[in-house]
Amino acid sequence: MSGGYALLDVGDGARLERFGDRIVERPHPAATGRRRNSDAWAAADLRWDRERGWLGTSPAQLPWSIPLDDLTLELRPTIAGQVGLFPEHAAMLPWLRERVGAVMARHGDEAADSGEAGDAGDAVSDPPVILNLFAATGLATLSLAVIGATVVHVDASRPTVAWARRNAERSGLADASVRWIVDDAPAFADREVRRGRRYGGILLDPPSYGHGPRSGAWRIDLDLAPLLVTCARLLEPDGFVLLTAHTEAFAADRLADELAAAIGRPGSRIETGPLRVATADGRRLELGAFARWSGAAS
């Protein structure tokens, strides 16, 4: 991740991060050990306290924006202690772009082989459609839109989808090929199966618990497995899945088991690992886990 974000210090149950020109302190149970930079902690602009909420920057100074690679993102403190960016997801973006690029290239080759070509002899093929469930404020959606993918962005929160659309506008992607959908992820995926839709890739970042606009409560321990089965029915044969989670009980091995059971393809190779960020001196803060699968050779 370049420019806009840095993990400055961790310790005593808290993390200190720089988002653009703002320094933010937030608690996290994995932030063990002792703090090393007392001056940096004293300079925090915003502090999240579980009892009192946000302390620091006045409302007149909000929101603010940061540059992140090809994007410009709007940040603001939320009642859940977030700011609109999950920096640990940035490490997934190179793999995502590589997978989408590979799918686009294969689609182009298939179009050329079938004789579909443009005036200059270039292959003509629709870009792959990527489904992003629990898509939040749009980091992954916009990172893929930049390289020409068509993305279906689904989140159950109308204000969060509006936030993602503002990020698209700030990033010069207001006219990108993105469908913005306010809906429950399971309900939307079920309807897409009935419609016969297929996707070149599917991203999921499910919360531990949640409530959507249509169905009842979401519980990851009960609802993830059937949703993954539905997603497997939506995948093109050479598609991919990226599953991330921040739930303590869903470490990388469990995510891999859930994904393997849903995909059900012999010989499937699933890569796993932690979602984490690191300080400049190499101390790591683990914030979740991922499992990813691709139906085509890397």
Residue ranges and their predicted role:
Residues 157-160, 182-185, 199-230:
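Mobile active-site "lid"/loop adjacent to the S-adenosyl-L-methionine
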Residues 137-149:
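Conserved SAM-binding loop of SAM-dependent methyltransferases across substrates and taxa
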Residues 235-236:
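Helix-to-beta-strand junctions that scaffold the AdoMet/dcAdoMet cofactor pocket
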Residues 240-298:
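C-terminal catalytic and target-recognition region of SAM-dependent MTase-like enzymes
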Residues 2-87, 94:
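Non-catalytic substrate-recognition/targeting regions of SAM-dependent transferases
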Residues 157-201:
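S-adenosyl-L-methionine
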Residues 150-155:
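Conserved SAM-binding motif I beta-strand of class I
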Residues 126-134:
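Conserved class I S-adenosyl-L-methionine
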